Amino acid sequence: MEQDKIRIKLKSYDYKLLDQSVKQIVETVKRTGSSVKGPIPLPTSRRRWVVLRSPHKFDQSREHFEIREFKRMLDIVKITPQTIESLMEISLPAGVDIEVKMRG
């Protein structure tokens, strides 16, 4: 069941929470004897909205809102069965989205 590579993509709106989760994954993988390439920071996606402050008049009074989505990527090589087992047992915070792909 030995694969060549596992690619993990993490997304979050809070970069501190994201970096903490990446650090936890890297420590777990290194403890099991596998090696990690990364974390690789991916481009941050930004969404912006401009909203009028008043109900119908005063066009010049506007409010700006922005939300940023931070992303990181990890590649795990030299995978062992203990690595896969320990990755499945990791509990990550609620604000972090994780996507795992195995490549053979």
Swiss-Prot record:
One of its GO terms (molecular function) is tRNA binding. It comes from Hydrogenobaculum sp. (strain Y04AAS1). Involved in the binding of tRNA to the ribosomes. The keyword Ribonucleoprotein applies. Transmembrane segments: none annotated. It comes from the Bacteria. One of its GO terms (cellular component) is ribosome. This is Small ribosomal subunit protein uS10. Belongs to the universal ribosomal protein uS10 family. NCBIfam families: PRK00596.1, rpsJ_bact. Part of the 30S ribosomal subunit. Keywords: Ribonucleoprotein, Ribosomal protein. One of its GO terms (biological process) is translation. Gene3D superfamilies: Ribosomal protein S10 domain. The keyword Ribonucleoprotein applies. Pfam families: Ribosomal_S10.
